[in-house]
């Protein structure tokens, strides 16, 4: 789905998880708890490929000026490998600009916010505990399972 289609698609799921976070669900009986057990639920890791992760979490594409979901390094500084100098993203900053994007009165205003910050609204931000910076996994299938990360380190950076 496109960026505009993803939020209405996940909104009912987020509604359910808000209720499960605040009220939970009560099981009348379980094998270990004959008197019943209450359970609260949360969505924590967002595990998907990089394109879906960016859409779901409200980050800009990996082609954007702000290409990283963990820092505010600009594409023009992409050759900077000194990670101590990378300005870290924060939840407060992300939520603030995502909320501004959501409340914008026009598509032009939304585009300006998105272009300037690399952030847009995600329905997942309605979850009171959800932190897109900490909970978005770094494309585990391609990075780890298919060993793209290892190949990148060995072939691109020349580290063995």
Predicted regions and their residues:
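Active-site neighborhood segments
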Residues: 1-22
